[in-house]
Regions:
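Alpha-helical transmembrane segments of multi-pass small-molecule/ion transporters
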Residues: 1-315
Length: 315
């Protein structure tokens, strides 16, 4: 319990620092939008390019793990999306709901937690999960939000507009360029490596600070929004790992890899959905609430999962 608390404490500290800075007036009301643009246009693209440029595809080729974790993410995303649409939410916000239910905080919590449990052998599966989450799942939600944002109904013209918007989106372009660079077999200069490491490393911490800034703004919160945030946090912490566990059995994933997949799926929601909400100017009350609630609740759900599955943190 204390070991998990030590891992997630910096998450709350970053959110709290943003909240406090806004409440005492050190940072102004426009900071949420402007700082989020720093994340979306600079830090996150650098991180995604770096991850994809250094991906060793021969090492990352773990078909059973990829199938189980990837299909679980997709199933939770699209089923949650469908339920939200049936409940009357629009496609853009329903896409965020789907992302909230399936977007695990693999980078900020997953890497250190699994490193404590499994050591360096956890790096490959966590990297795979991060690529599936940050690139594939994130891009899927982005495409749907782009589709929802265009009024054009002619299929070809709509496709052209959506592709044009996606082609100008650094969050999607950066990993594609990273894959292209990695395929050349050329290494990056040391100065470029340092640049990407420094800039990419700011993505998650800065996004957490921005969430704190957002939460500090006084705004009315409807009871329905609170219920939705609680429900989405439950989907992330209970349904997502349960579906992943079933699929690891279906695909006969080796026990240790299966345990890693379930633990990664059981992580709280990462900051990606909030970045998208701010980037597309979508309502972010439910999004920020679900991220905060899932992170708080994970302090109880992760130890319970480890207890019932016999997993223990290394001292």
């Amino acid at each position: 319990m204390l070991a998990i608390l030590a891992i997630v404490a910096p998450v709350f500290a970053l959110i709290g620092s943003g909240y406090l800075a806004r409440r005492i007036g050190v940072i102004g009301p426009h900071a949420v939008s402007e700082l989020n643009r720093v994340v979306v246009y600079l830090a996150l693209p650098a991180l995604l390019f770096d991850v994809m440029a250094h991906a060793s595809w021969s090492v990352l080729y773990q078909p059973d793990f990829i199938a189980a974790f990837g299909l679980a993410c997709g199933a939770v995303f699209y089923v949650t999306l469908a339920i939200s649409l049936i409940a009357g939410r629009r496609l853009a916000t329903a896409s965020l709901d789907g992302l909230l239910g399936a977007y695990a905080n693999t980078a900020y919590i997953g890497f250190p937690m699994l490193l404590m449990i499994y050591g360096k052998e956890s790096l490959v599966p966590v990297t795979i999960a991060s690529i599936l989450t940050v690139c594939v799942l994130f891009a899927s939600a982005m495409v749907l939000i782009e589709l929802a944002s265009h009024a054009e109904r002619h299929p070809l013209r709509l496709a052209g507009k959506v592709l044009g918007s996606l082609g100008r989106n650094p969050i999607l372009v950066a990993p594609i360029l990273g894959v292209a660079w990695g395929a050349t077999g050329l290494g990056l200069p040391a100065s470029a490596e340092t640049f990407l490491t420094l800039l990419g490393g700011a993505a998650s911490p800065l996004a957490l600070v921005v969430i704190g800034l957002f939460l500090a703004e006084p705004r009315p919160i409807a009871a329905s929004e609170t219920r939705t945030a609680v429900g989405l946090a439950a989907v992330k912490l209970v349904i997502h790992p349960a579906v992943t566990a079933l699929l690891t059995i279906a695909f006969a994933v080796p026990p240790k890899l299966a345990a890693m997949a379930v633990l990664l799926a059981a992580l709280p929601t990462g900051t990606g959905p909030f970045m998208l909400a701010e980037f597309y100017r979508l309502p972010a009350v439910v999004t920020s609430g679900a991220i905060l609630l899932s992170t708080l609740a994970a302090l109880m759900t992760l130890p319970l999962l480890m207890y019932f599955t016999g997993i223990s943190l290394a001292p």
